[in-house]
Amino acid sequence: MINKPYLLFLGDAPDQLAAKVGQGIKDWRPDISLGQIRLPGCKADLGLRDYTLEEAKNAGVKTLIVGVANRGGTFSSTWKETLCQALNLKFDIASGLHNLLSDEKEFKELASLNQCNLFDVRVTSTNFPIANGKKRSGKRCLTIGTDCSVGKMYSTLAIEREMLSREIKATFRATGQTGILISG
């Protein structure tokens, strides 16, 4: 379980679209999105309070979320100092990038030294069985599309919100990185 509340790391995102992970979390879970941290040159802004890492720690933030989806899904060299500083301040870090936090030697060592968690949401520790086609109880609404960034998750979260407002039992089941971070 990813510890809450979150500080959304936007790094040096070149535009608002690059911060789509952070934007999704802020839009759908504003209660756990305490603030944002941006590096010089960042062109994205979620409209949240800008924090330093120290301010965020004092405000009770538990996890720094990499809120950027960049080309190639890599950790920019300009981000590493901030991410290492976060680990030294005992923040957990969560990321949905293709490059894994746990594959970065420096992050892994600092997390171990400071007893922090690294959450690579692209990797699961759960072994999911292959579907068998047998009828199951309950009802499901599958949201599918032909491309990314077309609104599948936002639509599904809006359906969940409306059903819950009508006191209909509903749970959002994430399949992508942003959805997993929204779900926690």
Give the positions of each predicted feature.
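Walker A (P-loop) phosphate-binding motif
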Residues: F128-F172
